[in-house]
């Protein structure tokens, strides 16, 4: 039954994507509908997992659904106590595995941040393997872009990101944070010139920057002030939205 709900989510998502422009990926109508379907799928899956045998399949399902308890809307965060109970069912030796530790990070995640809060920071690395932190960019506005190679709207935003990098110069640091596998991400960066800094974070589950900034959908953008305060967070892309958002926070007299 849980799997049928998951299939329903996938089928209706495809249907939604084929609808008119009012229900495109970057639109709130799409995400509202997707979240409702996903909620039903997660609820059914977790109910089954309460009594199902703890096997490799059970572990993999835990990881697949875990991120839903972390950064998607408040209704899904209500599942976190249930997920903590599921984690407690895991044998101790499984909790010590790489997957077990990742599941534990989702069961007991780091707190998320909101607009007005100090920025969250963490370990990032570039394509050469060099370590970085967002703090090294303080003193400038920082625009975080959580994205993926396979995300259509993410790729659509690239020309406008090129524009804002040129427009704001050293007043703004654009930081792309990919959720792709390291090999495919590195290969892509070698073949495509991407704007700004292109970094990636180690797999850290519920304690990742993606989790802390609630990047449940992509592209997900976060604008940070030179003082390290979160000014604005939003999900989705449509032409002109980046310039429109930045213009509200960065005065024109700062532009080169």
Regions flagged by a language model, labelled:
Residues 1-132:
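Oxidative protein folding and maturation machinery
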Residues 116, 137-138, 168-169, 191-192, ...:
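A structural signal for short secondary-structure junctions
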Residues 123-125, 175, 189-227:
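Short, internal strand/loop/helix patches
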Residues 138-139, 146-163:
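Conserved redox-active cysteine motifs that mediate thiol-disulfide chemistry
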Residues 140-142, 219:
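Alpha/beta-hydrolase fold active-site loops
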Residues 144, 185, 198:
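Hydrophobic, well-ordered secondary-structure elements that form the walls
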Residues 155-192, 204-211, 244:
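Structural microenvironment flanking redox-active thiols in thiol-disulfide oxidoreductases
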Residues 217-218, 229-254:
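Non-catalytic, surface beta->alpha helical segment in thiol-disulfide oxidoreductase systems
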């Amino acid at each position: 039954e849980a799997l049928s709900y998951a299939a329903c989510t996938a089928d209706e998502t495809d249907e939604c994507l084929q609808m008119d422009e009012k229900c495109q990926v970057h639109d709130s109508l799409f995400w509202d509908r997707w979240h409702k379907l996903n909620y039903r799928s997660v609820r059914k899956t977790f109910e089954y997992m309460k009594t199902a045998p703890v096997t490799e399949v059970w572990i993999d399902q835990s990881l697949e659904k875990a991120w839903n308890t972390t950064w998607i809307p408040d209704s899904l965060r209500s599942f976190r106590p249930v997920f903590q109970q599921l984690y407690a069912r895991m044998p101790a030796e499984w909790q010590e595995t790489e997957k077990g530790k990742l599941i534990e990070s989702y069961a007991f995640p780091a707190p998320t941040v909101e607009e007005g809060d100090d920025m969250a920071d963490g370990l990032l690395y570039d394509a050469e393997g060099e370590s970085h932190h967002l703090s090294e960019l303080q003193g400038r506005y920082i625009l975080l872009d959580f994205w993926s190679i396979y995300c259509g709207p993410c790729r659509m935003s690239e020309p406008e990101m090129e524009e804002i990098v040129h427009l704001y110069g050293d007043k703004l640091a654009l930081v792309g944070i990919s959720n792709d596998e390291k090999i495919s991400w590195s290969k892509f960066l070698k073949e495509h010139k991407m704007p700004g800094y292109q970094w990636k974070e180690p797999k850290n589950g519920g304690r990742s920057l993606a989790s802390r900034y609630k990047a449940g959908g992509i592209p997900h953008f976060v604008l940070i002030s030179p003082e390290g305060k979160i000014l604005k967070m939003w999900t989705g892309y449509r032409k002109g939205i980046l310039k429109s958002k930045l213009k509200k926070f960065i005065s024109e007299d700062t532009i080169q």
